[in-house]
């Protein structure tokens, strides 16, 4: 289960991306979540995924 609060979700996803060294696509698959939905939730609070950095910022 992933956090519902967008700020906690932001921190959770970035931590998992950093610690696991997975791509966003791989992490979403591992967590069984929709990548587009995740990106929309975080975009709504001002965060965009940076593929070069492999994190939301």
Tell where the protein language model's regions lie, with residue ranges.
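N-terminal acidic leader/helix
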Residues: 1-23
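Short alpha-helical "recognition helix" segments of helix-turn-helix
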Residues: 27-28
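Short acidic, Pro/Gly- and aromatic-enriched capping/linker segments at domain boundaries
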Residues: 34-48
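Short, acidic, Ser/Thr-enriched surface-loop or helix-capping motifs
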Residues: 51
């Amino acid at each position: 289960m992933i956090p519902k609060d967008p700020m906690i979700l932001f921190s959770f996803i970035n931590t998992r991306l950093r610690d696991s060294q997975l791509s966003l696509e791989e992490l979403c698959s591992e967590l069984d979540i929709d990548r587009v939905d995740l990106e929309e939730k975080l975009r709504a609070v001002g965060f965009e995924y940076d593929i070069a950095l492999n994190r939301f910022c």
